[in-house]
Structure formats: C-alpha cells, structure tokens
Amino acid sequence: MKSGQADLFAQASGDSDLLIKPMNQLQIQDWPPRLEGLSETWLEILNDFWRSPDGLSLDQKMKAQLATGQVIYPRTPYRALTLTPFDQVRVLILGQDPYHGAGQAEGLAFSVGMGQKIPPSLRNIFKEVQRDTGAMSPEGPSAGSLERWASQGVLLLNTALTVADASPASHSDWGWEVLTDNIIKAIAQRSRPCAFLLWGAHAQTKASLIEIANQAARPHLILKSNHPSPLSASRPPVPFLGCGHFGRVNQWLKAAKQNPVDW
C-alpha cells in the first residue's frame, strides 16, 4: 500500500481473513442507512419512498448485493441531506452517481473524501469558480471535499445515491432516481426559491420536472451548461468553462437579500 493511503482503508471487524476494506465502503451492517440528523421534510420524503414498491424493490436489491460481498460506495448515501436541511437549501447542484473508486465518494455530488486526488470534473469546477469569482482553489488533504458548500445551503445531490465498485452508473436504474426526483420536486414546490445548476444532458432532463412542479411560478433560477467533464467542458452548445454560473447564483442571491455562497 502506498504511503498516504492507509487512512482510506480499515480492517473489517470479524473477518477471519482480515480483509482490508475502504473506509467509504457501505457495509451490510450500515443498511438501511441511518436517519439521525435529517430534517423533518427529508424524513417524510425518505419514509414515503421506502414504503413504496420502488423503495421496497431497491431495498431488496441492496440487501442482496451486500450479502454477496459486493463493494458499494458510499458508506453515507444520505450525507448531502444530512449536511443541507430541506429548509436551508438555496442552491441545488445535480450530479449523476457517486465516484466508483475506493476512498472517493463521500455522499456529495462531485465531492471526494479526505486525501483523495481531485478528479478532472471537480478540477474544472474549481477552475471555473476561480475564473468567475476570483476564489482560489482549495489546498490540503480536504481540498476535494465540498462540505463547505453544503454547509452554506448548497445541496450536492446525485440522482443515484450508490454505485458498485469500478462500475459507473451500475445503480442508476435501481430506483434511486424515483427518490431523488421526489426531492427535486419538493424543493421546486416549496415557497422559498432555489437556484438549480444542471450540468450535462442527464441533469438537464430534470428541468421539465422542476418546471412542472413549480406551478405557482416561484422565481427559481435554472442554469444549464455542458458537464464539467474534460470531454465536454469546453464544447458547444454551452461550455461549462466560461458559463459563469457561480457568479450568477451569487447575484441572484444578493437580489433576494440573501448572503452569497463563499465558493
């Protein structure tokens, strides 16, 4: 094991063969995820989902996979909801599914755990933040964690909340999207306006969901661009690099007499 990687792994208690497992791996004893620390509205949405046919089906799939020893990330699927209570959501940044490597996913879209190398998409996000707002890219072992955004009311939501190791989008059709669609609709329907940042074709499919849910014509801000991935960040029709979303969000917040986000 390379120097600096030891903190990303932990010995699985009770394993006779002393398997070493990533710290961010979802364990069978962690399922179903704990609900402590979640706001009342998040609890209502989650409980309604897990009682539904889609939720029951997803629960069975997760239990079956964990029972076979399938490596699944992250250990904390609800972390975005825990860090950003429903009534504090000011901005929603929509991702697709968690990073699928050991130590990476930490339950926040685009964010990576302590000591992890910053992925290319997140590197482009920081690059655009600096270009748009002048904020310097973070440094140090926690540089890739976006927890500081989440604590300011930025909900970093993936449309699927788990993924199998080394298998991108492996849980994208398991039913998570029913839950996350309900979360998006609940935010669009509440009285407090929200800025929705939709990067890439997958995220932009949710624009109509937001508009349909927003029957009261609340003054939400919906911003679209290409995905920050190097494959699309500089391409038309709306390159991510140069989109100016971070500055526009702060202008919108200031106009609504709210504090800007410290990106």
Tell me what each language-model feature is.
Residues 22, 26, 36-210, 214-216, ...:
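A polyanion-binding, active-site-adjacent surface
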Residues 1-15:
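Short linear clamp-binding motif
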Residues 9-12, 27-33:
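Short, Lys/Arg-rich amphipathic segments at extreme N-termini
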Residues 6-9, 218, 258-263:
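C-terminal catalytic domain of photolyase/cryptochrome flavoproteins
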